C-alpha cells in the first residue's frame, strides 16, 4: 500500500516511557529529509504554543490533584489544537508528519491504565482529531521492567512517568491490545535491540508502507546521531 499525498503521510510512534521511540522519531525524520521528503516532526502533548502550555500542566509533578477526566480533556485539547494548527495543514501541503505519541497513547494511558471508559476515550479522541488519523503507527515493544532500567539514568520523572510500575504495565498491555486489534495500521517493533537494529526495523516498516528511504539516507541519519 503506497502513501497518497494529503491522506496517508501521517506516521505516529508509540510505546511505554523509556521504549526509545523519541530517538527513532528523530532518526526517521532525518532519513526521510535526506531522502527528499518534507517532514514535520512533532511530539504530544505539545507542538503549538497553546499545546505546549497544556503540556506543562499535564506533566508538572506538582499537579497531583488532577483528576483522570481533567487529564483526558487536557490531552484532547492539546491534540485538537495541534491537528488544527499544524498536522492537517501539513498533510494538505503534501508533507510527511511524524508524531511522537498520538491518540493511541491516550487510549493506553487514560483507558487501559487509568480505567476510563474506552468508548468515552475513543469518542474524545475522534472529536479532537476531526477525521485526521495516522496511516501507520509504530509501537516500540519493550516491557515496563526493561524500560525502567533505561529510565533510571534519566533522573527525575514527570507526573506520568512517576505513576509506578503497575500503571506502566497496564499501559504496556494497552499497546499490545491495540496492535492485535489493528494489525494493518499498528506495527510492533522489538525495542530491546540496539538503536541501529531498531532503526533498521523502523525503516523496513516505513518502506513497506510506501515511502522510499535509500540505504544511504539511513546510514547518514545514524552517522549524524552518533556525532
Describe the residue ranges of each PLM region.
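Walker A (P-loop) phosphate-binding loop of P-loop NTPases
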Residues: 18
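Walker A (P-loop) ATP-phosphate-binding motif of ABC ATPase nucleotide-binding domains
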Residues: 10
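ATP-dependent small-molecule kinase phosphotransfer cores
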Residues: 35-129
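NTP-dependent small-molecule kinase module
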Residues: 2-4, 27-29, 145-227
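Conserved lysine of the Walker
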Residues: 21
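Hydrophobic anchor at the beta1->P-loop junction of P-loop NTPases
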Residues: 13
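Hydrophobic positions on the alpha1 helix immediately C-terminal to the Walker A/P-loop
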Residues: 24
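A glycine- and Lys/Arg-enriched "phosphate-lid" helix/loop adjacent to the NTP-binding pocket
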Residues: 101, 105-173, 177
Amino acid at each position: 500500500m503506497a502513501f497518497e499525498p494529503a491522506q496517508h503521510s501521517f506516521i505516529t510512534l508509540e510505546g511505554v516511557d523509556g521504549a526509545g521511540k523519541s530517538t527513532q522519531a528523530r532518526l526517521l525524520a532525518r532519513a526521510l529529509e535526506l531522502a527528499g521528503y518534507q517532514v514535520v516532526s512533532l511530539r504530544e502533548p505539545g507542538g503549538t504554543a497553546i499545546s505546549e502550555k497544556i503540556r506543562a500542566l499535564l506533566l508538572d509533578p506538582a499537579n497531583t490533584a488532577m483528576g483522570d477526566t481533567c487529564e483526558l480533556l487536557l490531552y484532547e485539547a492539546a491534540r485538537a489544537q495541534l491537528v488544527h494548527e499544524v498536522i492537517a495543514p501539513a498533510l494538505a501541503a503534501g508533507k510527511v508528519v511524524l508524531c511522537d505519541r498520538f491518540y493511541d497513547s491516550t487510549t493506553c494511558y487514560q483507558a487501559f491504565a487509568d480505567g476510563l471508559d474506552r468508548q468515552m476515550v475513543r469518542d474524545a479522541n475522534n472529536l479532537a482529531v476531526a477525521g485526521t488519523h495516522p496511516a501507520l503507527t509504530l509501537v516500540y515493544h519493550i516491557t515496563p521492567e526493561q524500560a525502567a532500567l533505561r529510565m533510571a539514568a534519566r533522573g527525575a520523572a514527570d507526573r506520568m512517568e512517576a505513576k509506578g510500575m503497575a500503571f506502566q504495565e497496564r499501559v504496556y498491555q494497552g499497546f499490545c491490545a491495540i496492535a492485535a486489534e489493528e494489525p494493518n495500521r499498528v506495527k510492533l517493533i522489538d525495542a530491546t535491540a540496539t538503536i541501529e537494529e531498531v532503526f533498521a526495523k523502523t525503516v523496513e516498516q516505513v518502506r513497506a508502507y510506501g515511502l522510499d528511504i535509500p540505504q544511504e539516507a539511513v546510514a547518514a541519519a545514524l552517522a549524524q546521531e552518533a556525532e
